[in-house]
């Protein structure tokens, strides 16, 4: 009996999903299946390919012939190279990044909410008033710094004068 490893189509229109199956070569695509080896979902990014490597190796060893699309999938997963005995030729299967769990996303949202709103809903008038208030605050801060610097200079001069007077008195 001639056995083939085929793709059996599932899914809705324009959303194909496939099973990688072992069937008699003469059966139709959706016919009786000898064994289900895995799944293939080309619509995901990257495509989801899950093939039971041990069973695929068994069926290839028994003489099952893969169709062209299945052969391409077996090369991607590295099963074909393993069957042929090609050294150092692993598959090029891309794995999707793991999604964050809903609990982690919820905790992040709580942390952001605890920090307070990041953007304020303000009108144009309030924005101008806010900008003017910020400018005033900056000007006041600069004036305070200048006043503090002048006071420090006067204090240094006063200390220097008092030291100079003390030295003059001790010299007399």
UniProtKB/Swiss-Prot annotation:
Q: Which GO terms describe its molecular function?
A: structural constituent of ribosome
Tell whether Protease is among the UniProt keywords: no
Q: Where is the composition biased (Acidic residues)?
A: 161-172
Q: Which GO terms describe its biological process?
A: translation
Classification via InterPro entries = Ribosomal_bS16, Ribosomal_bS16_dom_sf
Q: Which keywords appear in this protein's UniProt record, sorted alphabetically? A: Ribonucleoprotein, Ribosomal protein
Locate the region Disordered: 115-172
Tell me the name of the encoding gene.
rpsP
Organism of derivation: Corynebacterium jeikeium (strain K411)
Q: Which GO terms describe its cellular component?
A: cytoplasm; small ribosomal subunit
The biased composition feature labelled Basic and acidic residues covers 147-160
The answer to whether keyword Ribosomal protein applies is yes
The entry sums up its family as follows: Belongs to the bacterial ribosomal protein bS16 family.
- Annotated protein name in UniProt: Small ribosomal subunit protein bS16
């Amino acid at each position: 009996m001639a056995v083939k490893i085929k793709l059996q189509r599932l899914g809705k229109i324009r959303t194909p999903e496939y099973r990688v199956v072992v069937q008699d070569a003469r059966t139709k695509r959706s016919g009786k299946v000898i064994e289900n080896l895995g799944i293939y979902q080309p619509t995901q990014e990257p495509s989801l390919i899950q093939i039971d490597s041990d069973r695929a190796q068994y069926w290839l060893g028994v003489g099952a012939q893969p169709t062209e699309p299945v052969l391409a999938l077996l090369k991607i997963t590295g099963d074909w190279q393993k069957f042929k005995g090609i050294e150092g030729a692993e598959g090029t299967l891309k794995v999707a990044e793991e999604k964050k769990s809903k609990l982690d996303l919820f905790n992040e949202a709580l942390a952001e909410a605890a920090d307070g709103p990041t953007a304020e809903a303000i009108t144009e008038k309030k924005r101008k008033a806010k900008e003017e208030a910020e400018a005033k605050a900056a000007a006041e801060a600069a004036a305070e710094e200048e006043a503090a610097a002048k006071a420090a200079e006067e204090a240094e001069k006063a200390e220097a004068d008092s030291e100079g007077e003390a030295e003059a008195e001790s010299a007399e």
